[in-house]
A protein has these predicted regions:
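Functional transmembrane core segments of multi-pass inner-membrane proteins
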Residues: 107-110, 114-115, 125-232, 272-281
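Alpha-helical membrane-inserting segments
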Residues: 26, 30, 92, 96-100, ...
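Transmembrane helix-loop junctions in multipass membrane proteins, especially transporters and channels
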Residues: 32-36, 40, 98-106, 138, ...
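Hydrophobic alpha-helical transmembrane segments
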Residues: 12-17, 83-88, 120-124, 149-150, ...
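Membrane-proximal soluble regions of multi-pass membrane proteins
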Residues: 26-84, 252
Length: 281
């Protein structure tokens, strides 16, 4: 069995297991951050009877299944959202790991390997933040600074360190340009049409621009465009089914995040295919 396949499999399994654990933590984040609560204290407890949740009842997905979706103490039903978020985050992390480290493309030398690990951690951070921000924006129409602003520092530090080790400064330069470009673009939209874009969207745009630009120019363009395409299609569906008023507010953050991940995962392929169509044979 090739060493590269073994390394890739270990990375994918580690990402999936880590995603399950992070998903469990994100369930705490999406509940506490909008309420202004600490994410570390007090310990997790049943929202109904307030009994502390034991460590063996906090195993991602498995504990919910073992308890049949009920609190061990008061037997109150526990929302299925908890295991869904955990499982979805685990799968999301595997997909991200497979994108950042394609099979057969895992570095074996020390410096490139550490650079690739830093890049992977940066994208897994963005994946976890994306899950939390999407849920919070849907439920509260907010994109909390407590999640968005630290992402600038995390991205610049991790991706900058990756560039320093790999020598690929072009990727970091693209990232900084993408960060500035999307931030300015969304800020202009917010100023031209107040209310159409919130400041939370503007701040998130810079974060997404950093990661998209790092990935590539095609990914940046596709990711930026996909947000408006997906959000527009969703709005049309809601209006067509009369599930939303024409003046009703629809959170745009989830579509920014979804569009960005379309850009990261398939943006390069989409951009190349489009350019090929425009290029005469």
């Amino acid at each position: 069995m090739p060493a590269s396949f073994v390394a890739w499999s270990i990375a994918a399994l580690a990402a999936g297991f880590g995603g399950l654990l992070i998903g469990s933590f994100l369930n705490v984040v999406v509940h506490r951050v909008p309420a202004g609560m600490s994410i570390s204290t007090p310990p997790s407890a049943c929202p109904s009877c307030h009994a502390p949740i034991k460590a063996y009842d906090n195993v991602p997905v498995l504990s919910w299944l073992a308890l049949r979706g009920r609190c061990r103490s008061c037997r109150t039903a526990i929302s299925a959202r908890y295991p869904i978020v955990e499982l979805a985050t685990g799968l999301f992390f595997v997909v991200v790991a497979a994108r950042i480290w394609p099979l057969g493309d895992v570095p074996t030398e020390a410096a490139p390997l550490v650079a690739a690990l830093l890049e992977l951690v940066a994208f897994l951070w963005l994946a976890g933040a994306s899950v939390a921000l999407a849920i919070i924006d849907v439920e509260h129409h907010r994109l909390p600074d407590a999640i968005v602003l630290p992402s600038y520092a995390v991205g610049l530090v991790l991706l900058g360190a990756s560039s320093a080790l790999s020598g690929d400064w072009d990727a970091l330069l693209r990232g900084v340009i993408g960060m500035a470009a999307l931030f300015v673009f969304y800020l202009a939209l917010a100023l031209v049409k107040p209310g159409a874009m919130g400041l939370g969207d503007v701040k998130l745009a810079g974060v997404l621009g950093l990661w998209l630009g790092w990935t590539g120019w095609g990914e940046l363009v596709v990711g930026a465009f996909a947000a408006f395409l997906l959000g527009g299609l969703f709005s049309v569906v809601l209006l067509a089914t009369r599930r939303a008023q024409r003046t009703g507010g629809i959170p745009f953050g989830p579509w920014m995040l979804a569009g960005a991940w379309v850009g990261v995962l398939v943006g390069g392929t989409v951009a190349a295919s489009y350019l090929q169509l425009l290029t005469p044979a």
